[in-house]
Amino acid sequence: MARAKRGVIARARHKKILKQAKGYYGARSRVYRVAFQAVIKAGQYAYRDRRQKKRQFRQLWIARINAAARQNGMSYSRFINGLRKASIEIDRKILADIAVFDKAAFAALVEKAKGALA
């Protein structure tokens, strides 16, 4: 019978994958072959979702700004256009925060945007 010269290396690789798969359900955390596939797939999802997270947060901010702008009688696109014309440079993340936590300040921004459009 031939010698197994990479037993230590193989075990180390298997241990590494099984450690990464810790917490997965059933065979995905116990059987190397299944765990390997699960870890690879998890990596693909993580890679994809790191990019999607940026899109999703921007989407959320725009939805919040739109809702707050409409409460003050203005659409999102007209509000953003008004801010540009008034040369107010606040990014959407901060605008969304203001819309949620400081309604008076947001109303003041809407008035400035309306003034710039008029």
From Swiss-Prot:
Keywords: Ribonucleoprotein, Ribosomal protein, RNA-binding, rRNA-binding. Belongs to the bacterial ribosomal protein bL20 family. Binds directly to 23S ribosomal RNA and is necessary for the in vitro assembly process of the 50S ribosomal subunit. It is not involved in the protein synthesizing functions of that subunit. The gene is rplT. It comes from Proteus mirabilis (strain HI4320). PANTHER family: 39S RIBOSOMAL PROTEIN L20. Gene3D superfamilies: 6.10.160.10, Ribosomal protein L20. One of its GO terms (molecular function) is rRNA binding. It comes from the Bacteria. InterPro entries: Ribosomal_bL20 (IPR005813), RIBOSOMAL_L20_CS (IPR049946), Ribosomal_protein_bL20_C (IPR035566). GO terms for cellular component: ribonucleoprotein complex; ribosome. This is Large ribosomal subunit protein bL20. One of its GO terms (biological process) is ribosomal large subunit assembly.
